[in-house]
Amino acid sequence: MGEARKNWNPQQALNGQSQVSRVQLNHASELLQSMDPALHQASHDPFGAQAMVFTLLLSQQEDGCREQMSALEENGHAALVQEMGRLLPHIRAMDARTKLPLVDLAIPSLRQLSPAQFEAFSQTLQWLIESDQQIDLFEFALQKVVERHLRHHFVAQSRQAPSHHVILPLLPHAQVLISGFAHIGHDQAAATQLAFERGIAQLGELGKKLTLLPFDQCNLPQMNEAIEHLNLATPGLRQRIIFSLAHTVGADGSVTLKEAELLRAFADALDCPIPPHVDTPIETQPT
């Protein structure tokens, strides 16, 4: 059995780019009401917010978690480790769907850090992500949320003028993203191929010439590299890429939590943010 899936309509999801629906507002309210009070309280304090985000990144393996906490303590973060230890059981017990919303809740508090504190926070965040020698989908999504909503706040950055005004030179990079999303969301070859075809169909006739890449040519580092190129496109082209990814995700009419989080991360990275997808979970299906 695979991850629980939700109903998914790409067009409705992307309509949310410009308007948050009543359903989404109600869902956000429900998430806040169901959130552990200890985590909710921590999110409203800069120190607690840092500890909470770091705790979300701790290894699920007991030995790995202990090693990470010890390393942080040895590097002068004893108070932080103590707070992380207090929050850990609350983090472990939380609904996975509330993890990114919890990070969102912490953003205003994290913006209260000084530039030096933010730099220290960023370094620790990166160390925790890399400490297990691999990056999972949640870590990647969290990293993109932090980059968009925090780094841009502390580090003045002006978006480079678009150098791509047509889709043609972007197709190889779009191919990497669409292939990656197709593989991540589906285990069966036929379903993966269908998802890829639904995605490239949104790119017009030129897109139909693209072929599905093997997963070792479209993993997260390669997808991240593709984003760097796609960010040089006009807003309309970037939104078109996100539209293609939404159709890749929704090829089977449903979406898993990891697919929804990854889509949100890439939409943030391309400066085409979309609100979290909410719908009624349906029966768990093989993915």
Task: Tell me the role of every PLM-derived stretch.
Residues M1-E130, F138-T287:
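Small-residue-enriched hydrophobic alpha-helices in membranes
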